[in-house]
């Protein structure tokens, strides 16, 4: 049994006093009772659905609030954090000690004199590199969310649990002094890396707790040579590990969920001396337009103990997954064991030998697959390119490019080159190969079929792509296979998908120019300058 007096003393040390009751690491059964009990109002209220899962609403914040993210500027962080600047804008905005203290007072005052849920868990399935996290909240479903998403400790581990990091969620409190303090709004998500505390105020979005700890892992791990990656990962029958990087909508979750392979995790991983390990104990999947036919694993994971966010629940308790009226970013969190085909008992495996960068190129320029050199690996990892098709007022669909460093710029706490260095070092030590896979469009105007993309992934994973005869794509100087089993050969060279190759040429020159322009921000040191040669020639 955990000593609750010890927990209360630790809360007092944080500035949380006169707690009415501590509900410590509640069971799923208890959480279900707490979040559906009569009398709950507003965003605290959970609704039971016919799936067996409880649904909650997060209010106006149906996604993360990057404009309200701050890190305390101090001796520890001033030369390590990748601070936002005019030349390279990002979400790491500095906060002074006085402002931090006033926010901490607001949150601790909000949590004092209340009945609190305290959930202890781990971030990271590696004993050496995990962080012991304590989450303190007055809201039952927020405790449920973190129980789903972090790694659940054993009774034995809880006996001597010492938190390395504390998340204090004060979603009910806002900051009245934000204007004088020069902040973005009355809401805040603030981190103090010296005190090892995250404060949340004003936003009820569950993902702030998950991605907050990801940002923390992204700070501490690379500084000791351990990879911290925004990727999914799976392992084959022979123990061969693949990792899939990609921004939202590129196929990261879909392509790593493979009946022939066991899932390590779907979103956040580390790479240490033993191999690849999941940071999380659960999954946080998008549910918009979810169907059993298209994504059976996720669909079946939505049952008792899963927690739905911002979905529309009909009068009879059924869920309308096609209704995006609250947000397109409808979500579900569930413990990872709700998926059958997973690595057990610990979400970790050996070193990755295949590293796949997924991009959905709406310009129709990039090949469906290319093999990268070590220099190209760093270049395309730092570029983190994808593109969406957005309709314009005249009905023309224009591609909008996104360049997100390391396929996860929103969560990087250190300079992107540090993640690239660790990744390539780990890859070289493991003899891993890297591939750029375009799940987007080509000259036909259609999206590359999921059948062809799965065929490409199979060829990478079974090694047959290594035996393929290779050609080279000009401008980008990418190595592309001439034929792959189970893949339509007519699409492998994107130039062949255009009625007129000159069309590809002009689009390729346009896209190459965008890559070059984006990469300027990395050419501020010698290493960055050296990588320019690995990129496209504008």
UniProtKB/Swiss-Prot annotation:
Does the keyword Disulfide bond feature in the UniProt annotation? no
The enzyme's first-digit EC class, named in words, is lyase
Q: Which Pfam families does its entry note?
A: PEPCK_ATP (PF01293)
Where do the annotations place substrate binding?
64, 205, 211, 331
**Keywords on record:** ATP-binding, Cytoplasm, Decarboxylase, Gluconeogenesis, Lyase, Manganese, Metal-binding, Nucleotide-binding
Q: How is the cofactor bound?
A: Binds 1 Mn(2+) ion per subunit.
Which residues are noted in the entry as Mn(2+)-binding?
Answer: 211, 230, 267
- Per the entry, which co-factors are needed? Mn(2+)
Annotated Gene3D superfamilies: 3.90.228.20, Phosphoenolpyruvate Carboxykinase, domain 1 (3.40.449.10), Phosphoenolpyruvate Carboxykinase, domain 2 (2.170.8.10)
The reaction(s) annotated as catalysed by this protein in its Swiss-Prot or TrEMBL entry are: oxaloacetate + ATP = phosphoenolpyruvate + ADP + CO2
Entry GO terms, CC: cytosol
Pathway membership: Carbohydrate biosynthesis; gluconeogenesis
MF terms in GO = ATP binding; metal ion binding; phosphoenolpyruvate carboxykinase (ATP) activity
Q: Does the keyword Nucleotide-binding apply?
A: yes
Q: What is its main location?
A: cytoplasm
Gene Ontology biological-process entries: gluconeogenesis
Q: Where in the cell is it found?
A: Cytoplasm
Which residues does ATP bind? 211, 230, 246-254, 295, 331, 447-448, 453
* Subunit relationships: Monomer.
- What HAMAP family does the record point to? PEPCK_ATP
Q: What does this protein do?
A: Involved in the gluconeogenesis. Catalyzes the conversion of oxaloacetate (OAA) to phosphoenolpyruvate (PEP) through direct phosphoryl transfer between the nucleoside triphosphate and OAA.
NCBIfam families of this UniProt entry?
A: pckA, PRK09344.1-1, PRK09344.1-2, PRK09344.1-3
Q: What is this protein called?
A: Phosphoenolpyruvate carboxykinase (ATP)
């Amino acid at each position: 049994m955990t000593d609750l007096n010890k927990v209360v003393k630790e809360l007092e040390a944080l500035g949380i006093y006169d707690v009415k009751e501590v509900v410590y690491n509640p069971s799923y059964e208890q959480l279900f009772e707490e979040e559906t009990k009569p009398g709950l109002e507003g965003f605290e209220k959970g609704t039971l659905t016919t799936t067996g899962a409880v649904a909650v609403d997060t209010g106006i914040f149906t996604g993360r609030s990057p404009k309200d993210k701050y890190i305390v500027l101090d001796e520890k962080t001033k030369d390590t954090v990748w601070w936002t600047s005019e030349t390279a804008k990002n979400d790491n905005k500095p906060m002074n000690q006085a402002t931090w203290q006033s926010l901490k007072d607001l949150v601790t005052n909000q949590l004092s004199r209340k009945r609190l849920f305290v959930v202890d868990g781990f971030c990271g399935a590696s004993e050496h590199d995990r962080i012991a996290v304590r989450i303190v909240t007055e809201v039952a479903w927020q405790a449920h969310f973190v129980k789903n998403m972090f790694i659940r400790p054993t009774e034995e581990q809880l006996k001597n649990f010492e938190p390395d990091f504390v998340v204090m969620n004060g979603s009910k409190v806002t900051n009245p002094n934000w204007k004088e303090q020069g902040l973005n709004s009355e809401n805040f998500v603030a981190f103090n890396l010296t005190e090892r505390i995250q404060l949340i105020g004003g936003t009820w979005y569950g993902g702030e707790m998950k991605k907050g700890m990801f940002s923390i892992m992204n700070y501490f791990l690379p500084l000791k040579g351990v990879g911290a990656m925004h990727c999914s990962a799976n392992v084959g029958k022979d123990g061969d590990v693949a990792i899939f990087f990609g921004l939202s909508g590129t196929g990261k979750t879909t392509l790593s969920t493979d009946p022939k392979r066991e899932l390590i995790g779907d979103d956040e991983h580390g790479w240490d001396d033993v191999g690849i390990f999941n940071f999380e104990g659960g999954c946080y999947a998008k549910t918009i337009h979810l169907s059993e036919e298209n994504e059976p694993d996720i669909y079946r994971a939505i049952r008792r103990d899963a927690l739905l966010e911002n979905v529309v629940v009909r009068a009879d308790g059924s869920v309308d997954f096609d209704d995006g009226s609250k947000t397109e970013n409808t979500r579900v969190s569930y413990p990872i064991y709700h998926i059958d085909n997973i690595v057990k008992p610990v979400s970790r495996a050996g070193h990755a030998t295949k590293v796949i960068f997924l991009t959905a190129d709406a310009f129709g320029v990039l090949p469906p697959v290319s093999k990268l050199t070590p220099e190209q690996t760093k270049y395309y990892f730092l570029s983190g390119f994808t593109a969406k098709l957005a309709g314009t007022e005249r009905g023309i669909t224009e591609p909008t490019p996104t360049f997100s460093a390391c396929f996860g710029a929103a969560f990087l706490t250190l300079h992107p080159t540090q993640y690239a260095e660790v990744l390539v070092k780990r890859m070289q030590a493991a003899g891993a190969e890297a591939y750029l896979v375009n799940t987007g469009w080509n000259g036909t105007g259609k999206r590359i079929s999921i059948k062809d993309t799965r065929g490409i992934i199979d060829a990478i994973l079974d090694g047959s792509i290594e035996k393929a005869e290779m050609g080279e794509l000009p401008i980008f100087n990418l190595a592309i296979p001439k034929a792959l089993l189970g893949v339509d050969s007519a699409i492998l060279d994107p130039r062949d998908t255009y009625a007129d190759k000159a069309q590809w040429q002009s689009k390729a020159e346009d896209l190459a120019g965008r890559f070059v322009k984006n990469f300027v921000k990395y050419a501020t040191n010698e290493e960055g300058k050296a990588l320019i040669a690995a990129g496209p020639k504008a």
